[in-house]
A protein has these predicted regions:
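Short, positionally conserved secondary-structure boundary motifs
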Residues: 1-61, 89, 96-101, 122, ...
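C-terminal regulatory/effector modules of DNA-binding transcriptional regulators
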Residues: 61-132
Length: 132
């Protein structure tokens, strides 16, 4: 995961918060934009504001913006954005543990979540933007 502080005049949409509440993915729910290099208007990228501390040990903090690529598959060991029960968004590691898939936090105060039919991948976390 890279922290991206580069300035750019190219923008991607910020679609809401993730990790501690509902996640709205529709285009009409854009709450802002963020400059992001090497992208265009037809990009598969969007940003979500982090709420909560379940990924703190990976360096993902409250109010960080995570950049999501909705067309990049999430593989074992990747950090991804997921929709749970069609209402709650979260970012976690996707990990195979003893033949089963889990969403795994980077904070020992949270439990792993077994992947089932109620969990849908949104996209892979490809970058992070932090306001210093």
């Amino acid at each position: 995961l890279t922290v991206n502080n580069q300035l750019s005049n190219k923008k991607i949409p910020i679609l809401g918060e993730i990790a501690a509440g509902s996640l709205l993915m529709a285009e009409e729910n854009v709450i802002g934009t963020v400059n992001y290099p090497d992208t265009d208007e037809k990009s598969d990228l969007f940003a979500l504001s982090v709420s909560g501390d379940s990924m703190i040990d990976e360096g993902i903090h409250e109010k960080d913006l995570v950049i999501i690529n909705k067309n990049e598959p999430i593989k074992n060991g990747d950090i991804g954005a997921f929709l749970i029960n069609n209402s709650e968004g979260t970012i976690k590691f996707l990990k195979n543990i003893q033949g089963k898939q889990y969403l795994v936090p980077a904070n020992k105060n949270y439990d792993k979540i077994p992947v089932n039919e109620n969990i849908q991948p949104i996209g892979k976390v490809v970058s992070l933007i932090r306001d210093m």
